[in-house]
């Protein structure tokens, strides 16, 4: 019987602690978030986030944000699973029962059906639903996120601030930084400078990652030097004005692949073999010296999951 008062006191203390935590969390809201359309007020911490961008979704999952549904890309291709979700976080998406909104073409009706309290749109890229902004913003607070001009760590930090998951974002970045430091000690750099691309063999074209891209920034963090494009190279752009890629095709393809080593993001050995087999690229130093390296099909978009896989791949290669 003497335990009863102690038990009651323990319950009271636990209740006070929990209410204190809730009070602290509530004190963090509302929040003012600014994007290209102005300043938005989030009255409370989001509980039902819809990501119209498959690129953003991986970072939301990495910080344990309550993302309930996501846009998807073409299923069962080299970068996506049977749902059209990116392979590097496919398992996590299944565990958390992430719903697929649509494949490719955005749908405001599909978004509305999820009853979100926050909608995220990418500013550029093939997964951007920017054209539907006016419709989506009537459903729930809608934020436009640029991922093409920043590292995946900066994106993770930004999403942490938007969702109230700053702590989780900082923890993920710290975990990566620890592995990055270890990798830098281990890796022996191949011939420099390097060119980083996504190569499409069937179209004889490539998207080249710029120094502003998450991929380019990660390579520079590891000590790699990115090759500079030849002056006057006429490269094309699509999917809006983008900072992260330069599209190379035709006569510009060989001119743009001027690094001493080539890194193939979103590619495997078959893609490396296709470059070696392309007679128009046979004169490139990286091809002649067998310095073409595939970094894995899970690396099309960089987030916490794929960045860790890139580290593992580079350690295995070098």
UniProtKB/Swiss-Prot annotation:
Oligomer status and interactors: The complex is composed of two ATP-binding proteins (FepC), two transmembrane proteins (FepD and FepG) and a solute-binding protein (FepB).
Family in the record: Belongs to the bacterial solute-binding protein 8 family.
NCBIfam families per UniProt: PRK10957.1
Induction description: Expression is regulated by iron, via the regulatory protein Fur. Induced by hydroxyurea.
Name under which the protein is recorded: Ferric enterobactin-binding periplasmic protein FepB
One Pfam match: Peripla_BP_2
Localisation per UniProt entry: Periplasm
Keyword field contains Transport: yes
Keywords carried by this UniProt record: Ion transport, Iron, Iron transport, Periplasm, Signal, Transport
Record's signal peptide: 1-26
One GO process term, biological-process aspect: iron import into cell
Superkingdom of origin: Bacteria
Function (record text): Part of the ABC transporter complex FepBDGC involved in ferric enterobactin uptake. Binds ferric enterobactin. Can also bind ferric enantioenterobactin, the left-handed stereoisomer of the natural E.coli siderophore, and the apo-siderophore, enterobactin, but does not bind ferric agrobactin.
Record-level GO cellular component terms: ATP-binding cassette (ABC) transporter complex, substrate-binding subunit-containing; membrane; outer membrane-bounded periplasmic space
All copies of domain Fe/B12 periplasmic-binding, residue ranges: 48-318
PROSITE patterns in the record: FE_B12_PBP
SUPFAM superfamilies (UniProt xref): Helical backbone' metal receptor
Organism of provenance: Escherichia coli (strain K12)
